[in-house]
Each structure stands twice: as C-alpha cells, then as structure tokens.
Amino acid sequence: MIPDNTKFTNPFFGRILTAMVTPFTENGNVDYELAIKLSNYLFENGSDGIVLCGTTGESPTLSWAEQHDLFIAVKGSLDSSCKVIVGTGSNCTSEAVEATKKAYDSGADGALVVVPYYNKPPQEGLYKHFSSIANSAKDLPLMLYNIPGRTGCNLLPDTVKKLMDFSNILSIKAASGRIEEVTELRAICGSELSVYSGDDSLLLPMLSVGAVGVVSVASHLVGLQLKEMIQSFQSGKVANALAIHEKLQPLFKALFMTTNPIPIKAALELSGWNVGKPRSPLSPLSNDMKKQLSFILTSL
C-alpha cells in the first residue's frame, strides 16, 4: 500500500538518505560483508534510509545480479525502520521496468529512477518512460531523480506534475544544482511531492524554500551533524543550522573535487573503511587530492 505522503512534516523516506558507496574487495568484487557493516553504521549515525546502486553506488559498473545481491544483503541486515531504496533507472524503459518490478518483489522500500541518460528524450518521452515504471509496480514508492549534468536531459516541473497522477510517485531528488528547482517544483506540484536536495552544499538553502531532506554523500562521514542541521532549521534555530552548514562547506566541496564517488571512497579509506577503489573507467583519487582531503577531514 502506498503511504500518505501529504504531510510535509513527515516524509515517507525520512530526511537523511545516504547514497551509499558500493564497497569492492581488492579483486574488484562487491564486498557484501562490508556493505552490511557500512549500511548499519550509517543507520546508527543519522541516516533514515540507504540508497543503493545510485550514482555514488557506481550503478553503471554493477551488473543487475550484483545490484540485486547487494540489496538482499543490506536489506536483510538492517532494522526495518531504515528505508532501503534501490536505483532501478535505465535509459532503456523495458530494463527500468524489469528492475523496478524485481525491487518490489524483493521487498524494497522504494526505487530511485533516474532520468534516461544519453538518448535525451523529449518531455513526452520522459512522461511515458516514468509512467511505464510507475505502472509496473503500483505499490512501490518511487523517487524521481533529476540530474541533467549527468543525463543531458532535464525533467521539467510540468512533467513531474503530470506524473503525480500516479500515487506511487512520492518524491524527487533535485540535483540540477539550482535552488530555483525546488521553488518551481513546490509552486507547480505543491507539498504532496517531497523534494530532496541532491547536493549536500545546497541542503540548507533548499530547506529554506521547501525541500524536506537530502540524498547525501557527506552523511557517510557527518550524518549526525547533518541531522542536527535539519533539526535546528525545523525548530527555528536557524543560526545554529547556518553555523553547521558553514563548517561543513569545505568537506562538501572536497567530496566533489573530482567525479563522485572517487573522493568519498578515498575519504572513507582515510577514515578506516576499506571500501576499495572505484571500478573502471573511474580511477582512484590522486595523491595530491588525497592530501587535501585528509587535511579537511582532520579539521572536522
């Protein structure tokens, strides 16, 4: 059954969702044991939910079988109150439909469905693509994922509004880098659509114009601080929220000094989590960048 998502104060997926890295062994295989340990650590340190197999999880280099096995391992280990959302997007509609069906059948709490990349469909094509996905698993809550910098295609608010006719489309990860995106979505779609910042550095500004939370990379490292920032903002302690926002800005910037998830994997390694190197064609963080990152981590 699709939950009531109309309460701005209580978004179904929660407020801090960690876009979790996919750990790899030295041989480059998925390290399921470490994924279990990391996901539980994240839940215990501020995360309301875990997003698997998204951009940060290196979904383009994971097979569908690996993605399924990763979900089964993580979901089976976590407390039931922690939402587990699986990336099921593809630029092939039939593949996205099948992946979303499988996520639902396997017990996922939700699916993250990215705007189709490379083939650059028009808005009508995007509407039909997401309609097919929504119809394929009508009881699975969906989060749309708009990240035009990676996909080359922008999902417009008017199209999102049309898609809200499907009761399982509850939210959107807004990762265009534009604060105005939240304002536009709220104006057209209202409060029934939960808007999540897709950028840690824009979380506080986006909260101020109606976002409900964040799909975060930095929460691997500072989940409790992000939680305090959101709670401070909600309770009217804006000065404290701003102080946390400003303190964490160097980290937010460092985690995107090169392509995500290269820096966060290096940061986790520096913090004692041997999550392995990114899969090719991504490459490890350079030594110079790693020194910069290490300095920032020690200053937190």
Curated annotation (Swiss-Prot):
Main location: cytoplasm
Binding site for pyruvate: T56, V215
Record's catalysed reaction(s): L-aspartate 4-semialdehyde + pyruvate = (2S,4S)-4-hydroxy-2,3,4,5-tetrahydrodipicolinate + H2O + H(+)
Domain of life: Bacteria
Catalytic residues in the record: Y145, K173
InterPro entries in the record: Aldolase_TIM, DapA, DapA-like, Schiff_base-form_aldolases_AS, Schiff_base-form_aldolases_CS
Pathway: Amino-acid biosynthesis; L-lysine biosynthesis via DAP pathway; (S)-tetrahydrodipicolinate from L-aspartate: step 3/4
GO CC annotation: cytosol
EC number: 4.3.3.7
Location(s) in or outside the cell: Cytoplasm
Annotated positions for site Part of a proton relay during catalysis: T55, Y118
Keywords (A to Z) from UniProt: Amino-acid biosynthesis, Cytoplasm, Diaminopimelate biosynthesis, Lyase, Lysine biosynthesis, Schiff base
Family stated for the protein in its record: Belongs to the DapA family.
Function: Catalyzes the condensation of (S)-aspartate-beta-semialdehyde [(S)-ASA] and pyruvate to 4-hydroxy-tetrahydrodipicolinate (HTPA).
Subunit structure, as described in the record: Homotetramer; dimer of dimers.
This protein's name: 4-hydroxy-tetrahydrodipicolinate synthase
Gene behind the chain: dapA
